[in-house]
């Protein structure tokens, strides 16, 4: 058995995988001091900057958990993947893509510069703030709770429970997010919002404030890896085409303005949030039979110390190492 290769059909192999991940979580946890926790949302700055945890759930039932896996944190921008999926299920993929494009921006996630200088002026993709706010306006319902109910129901089917809103995070975002309000007014002026602005922003702030764990993120990733079908029940929860577009967006746009580097060096669809979470999707692949998770897996990471792009600094390093050692890249 060579490093990075293991036969998962044996208990020894599973123990090796667990020991391997434990060792590298401990190694990268020592590098969390290179980043800083988010402070522009006041509630987030209370997170432990030294925390680091990972959960990997395979289609074959293998589960690897290491580090700070029991900590809850707000999902933040990772929820943009889910709101996009639900909007497409309700309104149709083609309609949603008339309102929001699928192009990377190369700009900060809360920038509006591309809206001002490009024609047409629609948001570049649903994973930046302008796109996610537009998508929130497209969700069916007259109130924020009505708009979010299908998203809650989808998560309940995926996870087996309904995540709760962290009220302190929600209030913190609602009361301090002047940039998102400015983006909202700009989108309203350009005619991209289909709901009242206050309801749209309330919806957006609420779905960004849902509490999750790394296990929750890994399970969401596993369903996406399986093209929207829950591997435990074989129930199709997300239409295949929508799941595939969502994964494509994660690969090209999911890591803010570091998406190109992440795609090049890690090579799997992923979406990060400023709370320190990362949702990653490993599709099935046909390669060396000794490699782990050939059937696909979902990965959830939490490390609130962020780099300059707003991504978990230790989480990205951990994912890059595991992806390289286990040949997880799509390419």
Swiss-Prot record:
Top class in the EC scheme: hydrolase
Hydrolase keyword on record: yes
Residues bound to substrate: 77, 129, 173, 180, 204, 256, 274
Signal peptide span: none
Molecular function per GO: glutaminase activity
EC numbers, comma separated: 3.5.1.2
Catalytic activities: L-glutamine + H2O = L-glutamate + NH4(+)
Gene Ontology biological process: glutamate biosynthetic process; glutamine catabolic process
Keywords on record: Hydrolase
Superkingdom: Bacteria
Positions of transmembrane segments: none
Record-linked PANTHER family: GLUTAMINASE, GLUTAMINASE 1
Similarity remark: Belongs to the glutaminase family.
Subunit structure: Homotetramer.
Protein name, entry field: Glutaminase
Species annotation: Oceanobacillus iheyensis (strain DSM 14371 / CIP 107618 / JCM 11309 / KCTC 3954 / HTE831)
Origin organism lineage: Bacteria, Bacillati, Bacillota, Bacilli, Bacillales
Gene responsible for this protein: glsA
């Amino acid at each position: 058995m060579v490093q990075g290769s293991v036969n998962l059909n044996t208990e020894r192999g599973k123990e090796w995988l667990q020991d391997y991940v434990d060792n590298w979580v401990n190694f990268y946890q020592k590098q969390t001091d290179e980043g800083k926790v988010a402070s522009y949302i006041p509630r987030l700055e209370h997170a432990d900057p030294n925390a680091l945890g990972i959960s990997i759930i395979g289609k074959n039932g293998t589960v690897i958990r290491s580090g700070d896996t029991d900590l809850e944190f707000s999902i933040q921008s990772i929820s943009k993947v889910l709101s996009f999926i639900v909007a497409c299920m309700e309104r149709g993929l083609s309609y949603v893509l008339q309102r929001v494009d699928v192009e990377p921006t190369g700009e900060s996630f809360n920038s509006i510069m591309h809206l001002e200088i490009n024609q047409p002026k629609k948001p570049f993709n649903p994973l930046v703030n302008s796109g996610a706010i537009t998508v929130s306006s497209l969700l069916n319902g007259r109130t924020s709770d009505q708009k979010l109910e299908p998203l809650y129901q989808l998560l309940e089917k995926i996870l087996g429970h309904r995540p709760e809103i962290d009220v302190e995070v929600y209030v913190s975002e609602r009361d301090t997010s002047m940039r998102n309000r400015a983006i909202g007014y700009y989108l309203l002026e350009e005619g991209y919002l289909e709901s009242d602005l206050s309801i749209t922003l309330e919806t957006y702030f609420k779905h960004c404030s849902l509490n999750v764990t790394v296990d929750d993120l890994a399970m969401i990733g596993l369903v996406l890896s399986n093209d929207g079908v829950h591997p435990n029940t074989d129930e199709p929860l997300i239409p295949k085409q929508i799941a595939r577009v969502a994964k494509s967006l994660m690969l090209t746009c999911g890591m803010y303005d570091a998406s190109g580097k992440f795609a090049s060096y890690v090579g799997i669809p992923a979406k990060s949030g400023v709370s320190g979470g990362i949702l990653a999707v490993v599709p099935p692949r046909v390669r060396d039979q000794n490699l782990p998770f050939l059937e696909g897996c979902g990965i959830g990471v939490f490390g609130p110390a962020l780099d300059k792009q707003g991504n978990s600094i230790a989480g990205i390093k951990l994912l890059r190492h595991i992806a390289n050692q286990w040949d997880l890249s799509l390419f």
